[in-house]
């Protein structure tokens, strides 16, 4: 709900459990309060913001909703032009779930419209800014917005993630003290070195204290800053990265920034994660339909793809219960390595002499859907596409363009390149019965200089969005998985347009526990594609040999198989079939339920992750042991989110336990050797009353 109290000059945004108050008494709107719900009738409890000294006048500016560079503000700003801007509130427009505050520059150069949307059930507020130029103006910073943390006696700690290829989503913390913490990407995509979200929390653990989350829906270069002043004002800003940022706006041109999402929880970081997971499932592309168990043939064949071998793999995949068969890189052009063929999106006639239809028909007859890997944004120098259009890549004048993984990046800011990519994808989806695309991007964006070509990086991302949006409208039944050499493009901008993410090329089950911990801080398990693979030989990830351990780690998200199943023994085939069948019985709990990170792999030799159905009648508990010293005794694992007076049967032990017992006394870990693991499925049961 949104209320505008004109007399008190207050705009109040309310969700089920939170309030966000915006004061309009000052020349520009300020954030008065964001936190647990408060009563509108108590508006007079806010004290005036006083000056401190002649060195620190107009301290209300530290609380601005959208601070701009005006020559008078000393803190970080959200908007900066080539001239100072003096914005004043012009009018406020309120609808049931959306509000707009229109600000006008005193000199009439531009207009800023702050847009707010509320998602009440998830306690999420979406913010963005629409900029309209009244005359030509040069922008060098353009954030989505700002928000303020409340003054608390407990200090705030920032929680965020860092990483690199094959080591994404490593959790980090930092105290928010005087100064500035800056998270960012300058690589042309949202990761993998950092990810566009920040959580400020003051609890002792995941289930206590308050937590405030900020996430940005943008898949290009971004920045999030958390700044703290000596007067106790702690502001978080988020938006497109202003490093080498230039946007030349013409008169009457308008632009809306990427959305910024705010979420607050009084139940700690864990509750905040669950709210964001609900938001992503209910309001973004993920939806709530079950994710299919897939098989991807990449690790079985690499580039040596051929129809006959793929059909054999498909038969074995179907036998073990796979629902979606995916052919990865190597099916097109002269693609026998990563050195050639990228960009030539026609089926290789030597590998598929009867066309791709033969394999697709075979897959469908086996009862599976068919999927395909694509990398539409890249091109090899050794390709027909590049030889025909060498001007279609990002490049600097008088400079040899840089290759990464033997490829260039196509310049999607050019309309003809965007049109080519869209037509190519339309052609594939219209020609073949494809229900899934894995969209990859295996390099950073280089050879871009915005002082020469303003807004080029951003135009690339906007073109990417237009293509994905068009495909979503024209092919609503096709799921797209976002991939960028692993988890370099996981963000809410892609989550609005793709069904799931490939979060890392590292499929080592132990490493994945850490990656999945960091990922689920902000993103839903339903969107997390997890594979069971062979123990790798290339050294970029360390394998754990036990298939059960590998399956249990991969079952914590959307299960996939990436192993070379042609080499599995009969016993291993049976094991795969049993584990896949078991996952299917409770995958809805994992994919649509509430997640509790009970014990973190970064803090304990035993990691524990629990998923609880929304009606609290079903739960799945995963336990993973890293190592154990001789005689070491582990504390019981206390479950969360169950009904106290309900009894639950456990499929692993065959016993029945009371919800209150499992939450208060806890369960014995029951793990023994290094890299041991367990999965326990609990279902509510009715106990028969004994006769007196």
What are these regions (language model features)?
Residues 288-423, 436:
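Aromatic-lined carbohydrate-binding/catalytic grooves of carbohydrate-active enzymes
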Residues 247-265, 677-685:
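Short Pro-Gly-centered flexible turn/kink motifs
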Residues 17, 129, 252, 295, ...:
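Conserved, mostly hydrophobic/aromatic
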Residues 380-419, 461-566:
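Glycan-recognition surfaces
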Residues 4, 9-12, 29-227, 243, ...:
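Polysaccharide-binding surfaces and accessory modules of carbohydrate-active proteins
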């Amino acid at each position: 709900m949104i209320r505008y109290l004109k007399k008190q000059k207050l705009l109040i945004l309310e969700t089920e459990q939170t309030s966000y108050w915006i004061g309009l008494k000052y020349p520009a709107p300020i954030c008065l309060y964001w936190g647990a719900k408060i009563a509108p009738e108590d508006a007079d409890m806010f004290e005036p913001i006083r000056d401190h000294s002649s060195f620190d006048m107009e301290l209300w500016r530290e609380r601005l909703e959208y601070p701009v560079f005006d020559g008078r503000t000393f803190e970080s700003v959200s908007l900066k032009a080539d001239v100072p801007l003096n914005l004043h509130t012009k009018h406020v427009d309120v609808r049931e779930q959306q509000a707009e505050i229109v600000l006008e520059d005193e000199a009439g150069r531009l207009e800023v419209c702050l847009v707010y949307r509320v998602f009440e059930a998830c306690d999420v507020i979406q913010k963005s800014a629409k900029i309209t130029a009244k005359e030509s103006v040069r922008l060098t910073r353009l954030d989505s917005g700002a928000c303020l943390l409340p003054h608390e006696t407990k200090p705030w700690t920032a929680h965020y993630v860092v990483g690199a290829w094959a080591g994404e989503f490593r959790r980090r913390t930092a105290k928010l003290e005087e100064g500035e913490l800056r998270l960012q990407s300058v690589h042309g995509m949202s990761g993998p070195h950092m990810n566009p979200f920040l959580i400020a929390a003051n609890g002792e653990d995941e289930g206590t204290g308050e937590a405030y989350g900020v996430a940005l829906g943008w898949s290009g270069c971004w920045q999030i800053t958390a700044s703290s002043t000596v007067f106790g004002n702690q502001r978080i800003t988020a938006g497109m990265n202003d490093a080498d940022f230039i946007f030349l706006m013409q008169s009457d041109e308008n632009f809306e920034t990427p959305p910024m999402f705010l979420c607050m929880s009084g139940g700690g970081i864990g509750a905040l994660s669950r709210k964001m997971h609900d938001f992503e499932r209910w309001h973004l592309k993920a939806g709530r339909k079950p994710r299919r168990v897939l098989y991807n043939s990449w690790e079985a064949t690499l580039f040596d793809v051929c129809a006959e071998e793929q059909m054999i793999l498909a038969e074995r995949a179907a036998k073990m219960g796979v629902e979606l068969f995916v052919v990865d890189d190597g099916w097109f052009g002269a693609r026998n390595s990563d050195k050639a063929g990228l960009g030539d999106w026609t089926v290789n006639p030597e590998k598929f002499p009867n066309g791709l239809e033969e394999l697709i028909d075979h897959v469908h007859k086996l009862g599976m859907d068919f999927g395909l890997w694509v990398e539409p944004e890249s091109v090899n120098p050794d390709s027909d596409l590049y030889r025909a259009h060498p001007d279609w890549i990002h490049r600097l004048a008088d400079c040899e363009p840089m290759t990464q993984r033997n490829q260039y990046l196509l310049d999607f800011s050019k309309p003809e390149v965007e049109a080519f990519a869209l037509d190519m994808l339309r052609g594939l989806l219209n020609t073949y019965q494809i229900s899934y695309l894995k969209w990859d991007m295996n390099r950073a964006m280089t050879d871009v200089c915005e002082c020469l070509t303003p807004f080029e990086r951003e135009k690339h991302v906007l073109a990417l969005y237009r293509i994905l949006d068009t495909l979503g409208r024209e092919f609503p039944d096709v799921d797209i998985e976002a991939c960028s050499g692993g988890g370099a493009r996981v963000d809410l901008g892609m989550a609005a347009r793709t069904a799931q993410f490939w979060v890392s090329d590292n499929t080592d089950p132990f490493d994945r526990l850490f990656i999945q911990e960091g990922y689920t801080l902000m993103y839903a398990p339903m969107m997390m594609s997890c594979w069971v693979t062979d123990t790798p030989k290339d050294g970029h990830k360390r394998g754990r040999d036990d298939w059960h351990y590998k399956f249990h780690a991969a079952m914590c998200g959307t299960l996939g198989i990436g192993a070379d199943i042609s080499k599995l023994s009969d016993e291993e085939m049976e094991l795969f079939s049993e584990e896949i069948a078991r996952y299917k019985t409770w995958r809805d709990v994992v994919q649509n339920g509430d997640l509790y990170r009970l014990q973190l792999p970064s803090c304990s030799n035993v990691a524990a992750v629990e998923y609880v159905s929304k009606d609290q009648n079903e739960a799945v508990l995963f336990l993973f042991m890293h190592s154990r010293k001789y005689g070491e005794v582990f504390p019981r694992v206390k479950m969360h989110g169950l009904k106290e007076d309900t009894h639950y049967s456990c499929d692993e032990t065959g016993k029945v336990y009371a919800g209150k017992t499992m939450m208060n006394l806890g369960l014995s870990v029951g793990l023994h050797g290094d890299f041991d693991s367990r999965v326990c499925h609990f279902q509510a049961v009715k106990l028969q009353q004994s006769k007196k």
